[in-house]
Amino acid sequence: MQMAQFLSLVRGDSIESPREITSPSNLISESGSNGWLIRFFDSSFFCEWIAVSYLYKHQHSGVRDYLCNRMYTLPLSGIESYLFQICYLMVHKPSPSLDKFVIDICAKSLKIALKVHWFLLAELEDSDDNEGISRIQEKCQIAATLVGEWSPLMRPHNEPSTPGSKVLNKFLSSKQKLFSLTLSPPTQKSLLFSPTSGSNLQDDGSQLSADDNKIFKRLIPSPKVRDALLFRKSADKEDEECEKDGFFKRLLRDSRGEDDEQRSNSEGFFKRLLKDNKSEEEEISNNSEGFFKRLRSSKGDEEELTSSSDGFFKRLLRDNKGDEEELGANSEGFFKKLLRDSKNEDEEPNANTEGFFKKLFHESKNEDDKVSNAVDDEEKDGFLKKLFKEKFDEKRNGNERNETDETVYTDETSGEDNGREGFFKKLFKEKFEDKPNIGKADDGNESEDDESSEFSLFRRLFRRHPEDVKTTLPSENCSNGGFVESSPGTENFFRKLFRDRDRSVEDSELFGSKKYKEKCPGSPKPQNNTPSKKPPLPNNTAAQFRKGSYHESLEFVHALCETSYDLVDIFPIEDRKTALRESIAEINSHLAQAETTGGICFPMGRGVYRVVNIPEDEYVLLNSREKVPYMICVEVLKAETPCGAKTTSTSLKLSKGGIPLANGDAFLHKPPPWAYPLSTAQEVYRNSADRMSLSTVEAIDQAMTHKSEVKLVNACLSVETHSNSNTKSVSSGVTGVLRTGLESDLEWVRLVLTADPGLRMESITDPKTPRRKEHRRVSSIVAYEEVRAAAAKGEAPPGLPLKGAGQDSSDAQPMANGGMLKAGDALSGEFWEGKRLRIRKDSIYGNLPGWDLRSIIVKSGDDCRQEHLAVQLISHFFDIFQEAGLPLWLRPYEVLVTSSYTALIETIPDTASIHSIKSRYPNITSLRDFFDAKFKENSPSFKLAQRNFVESMAGYSLVCYLLQIKDRHNGNLLMDEEGHIIHIDFGFMLSNSPGGVNFESAPFKLTRELLEVMDSDAEGLPSEFFDYFKVLCIQGFLTCRKHAERIILLVEMLQDSGFPCFKGGPRTIQNLRKRFHLSLTEEQCVSLVLSLISSSLDAWRTRQYDYYQRVLNGIR
């Protein structure tokens, strides 16, 4: 009991403050029961799947915090595979650490940020907590735009500085370079420090002027100053006081030995400040020289003055109309007015500027005797402290604007204290402090308006963070020491000036008046793994391009989806096509405009691409009863990558649970040599490494090459355990041995095919008998013709309408111009590569590097989140088969959910549905006819196409059984150019079915025309490829059982989502688990798979559903 209380106390204390687990020993010492979990997370087995699954199973904040910290080490491509589940958990199982992780990865990848936005948008439309989801969505948007780390889609072009803001642009560019230098490693030598011509180069490669070069050289800090600024994150509070002296000694050090250069620089400073014409240069030089004598007597040492202040103060203090002459003639009076104290004079709007020069060049006669005795104090509290010093007891007095346009400098009304409230007091005013109303300038005073606009932007660059104001106010009220530390010019000020990326999120303009981010208990501390990168500035061009790309990409996808939604109400079909063409033309015009704001990201596929055009003649309207999906081609350009970007070979590999994307980019491994039937084995694979034992290869080869002439075959299966020995057991019959493990005591599945002993010689089938014979079941083609004939007479079977609702009857008829299918004909009418070359030749972007063509389907009106889940599960089955080395073939595709009723779907090139193949070619009445015409019967390519068909049939049959995928008519079955079959459209799975009636009760679709391709028939006639199909189904099912929890848990995470497939409630997950038959032995599982195949052989319900689709929707 005491131990339990102690553990609970420890857990309670850990929730009070954010935690960051740096070593596993800390958590192990807190709770011994969690030690194994931490060791598991730190092992090499840790991956994206483990992270997501344990985030779902564990509610403890400590476990979640540790998992989120560990997820930072995982690749973004793997995280993107489970982004759908992560966003769902973030909404329905909230955690501060998970929120922060999602926000951080949004800052690293534009595609992830876009997908997070769309996933949250879909949840926002279904959830009651709209405010909470909107808040997270806005934070992700800020992270992706203002503090994004991803490279812009286009290289930002340097904008030329306008004549009205040369001074400000010069300062901004110098300040940005100063930030990058102070935050770069001191050991790196930049070209900017070189005295050669390389130092005169700007970012775009253009030459700097001589004045600009001097300004920049003066702003470059020494390596010691950079070292002092780099320690800001690691310094403790107790070390701040002792390090401050050294910090400002280095920052304000004297540059002795440069008196001549300083004198020339300062002399040039006031020459340009008060210059009227060339004849007055000598007089102004003498005045400025006398001024510096007074300055040196008050300070005791010389401070370096940068020439950057030349143009700045000249613009700040000059009059807008012809005041340069008056400045030249009355320069002596200017300095008298500049340096005198006037406590009883009226205060004018420009008193702040005059107060600045008073503070900057104030004569302090009382300090003449202290110059030699307090050198260190002068270095610490000298120039910059006077320059940036801030007064807290602020007085607000009304000001009046002088009616004339001839005066620039006015007299002061405030005393010595108000005189200090000058230029930099206004510059460093807090962000949330009320701004006094000084008055309005005259309409003709254009320079005053220009000055105020630039001044507000200049002050915003150095604004103080609101949290700093909150933390410094108590100390300011308590003692004067707090004022010294937090006022501008001190070390704390500079530490806050170069604040972290996380602070700049809250300081952004888009964050507005929203609440600042609260640190919730249990959230991990922010990690700063890249201190050498310069912090992003909200005003630079790269940030503007990121913001533009993010919003333009969202608008682009929204316009595509809304087009599909609006086409529903347009009739007839010709008007619908015209409207779609006009909409595409309008989107193309928007694409051209988006090029100036950063470009539009193509959100699908592997890699980062920028959308440049949509060919207007390449759209296709797809057949649908109630919706109007359409297919388009999109021209894209590969996004520009920064120099030095690492390219790894891992990008070509499929991640765990990843989806092969982007129209043929799927990296599908070739099957091992033992997967080939003996008669079709290719020579190229004979020398490759074998993945299974020799006995397994021999057994499968024997099973595949066995030509049985008996009509009925009995299958006898048994599981045997053999010790590791070199002896081989030989059976008298035809024996197939399947290896199921690699342990020392191996388990073998023995498959024996024997003829029925009751058969006589007369029962032996004649080998010359035609392969496709008629049998007791009515052929699909004959039955369909009978139904069509009855419909023509006004008769129809019960429950079937005479015509498809809303469908053109021409869909069921062969094409008028359809010819005979030949071996070289493209299934889709045109090969994808030929289409790609044709469009590239006609496109104005075709000659640009990185050009590519993508094809997508835009769909609206359906919630495609269930289809996204189905494709994700198929990708997991794909990984399971690949890891086991099995040749079962699957082709996942990408479904990108953009809302609860819209989605973008990847198209699979060079494919066509069985329905479209039969409709296009009159000579094709069955799938066997298609194979005979396409691949030439009995040719090597025909055998290879048969093998591809069997491998894909076995893979999809298991998936359809385990996930209970329904609505398997020929419109949802595709064929590719290599003979693979591909399933699409997973709107009915797990517990729902078309019409709410489970009419398709067979485990999977295995009709006669599918069996004919495997040289079998509706009775299950044994053949080489049909036996191969059985073996693959047995191997695949035994392998899937080992990963059952991986599939079940992925589905269980979303069981409360309200998807149609979960309408069965908790029984949905229970039935899914039952279909894996985890309680059966492997021998029993073999018999189970064979019984599933037998139950699916040309099942009556499956055939009747095909008849129904043919009559109702014209699907052949």
Curated annotation (Swiss-Prot):
Q: What does this protein do?
A: Acts on phosphatidylinositol (PtdIns) in the first committed step in the production of the second messenger inositol-1,4,5-trisphosphate. Necessary for proper organization of the trans-Golgi network (TGN) and post-Golgi secretion in root hairs. Together with PI4KB1, required during polarized root hair expansion and pollen tube elongation. Functions redundantly with PI4KB1 upstream of the cold response phosphoinositide-dependent phospholipase C (PI-PLC) pathway.
Q: Pfam families annotated for this entry?
A: PI3_PI4_kinase (PF00454), PI4KB-PIK1_PIK (PF21245)
Question: Would you name any one GO CC term?
Answer: cytoplasmic vesicle membrane
Enzyme class (EC, first level): transferase
**Signal peptide position in this chain?**
none
The entry sums up its family as follows:
Belongs to the PI3/PI4-kinase family. Type III PI4K subfamily.
Q: Domain of life, per the record?
A: Eukaryota
**Region annotation 11 X 20 AA approximate repeats (PPC): where it falls in the sequence:** 210-507
Q: Keyword annotations for this protein?
A: Cell membrane, Cytoplasmic vesicle, Developmental protein, Golgi apparatus, Kinase, Membrane, Phosphoprotein, Repeat, Transferase
Q: Where is the PI3K/PI4K catalytic domain?
A: 830-1101
Q: What name does the UniProt record give this protein?
A: Phosphatidylinositol 4-kinase beta 2
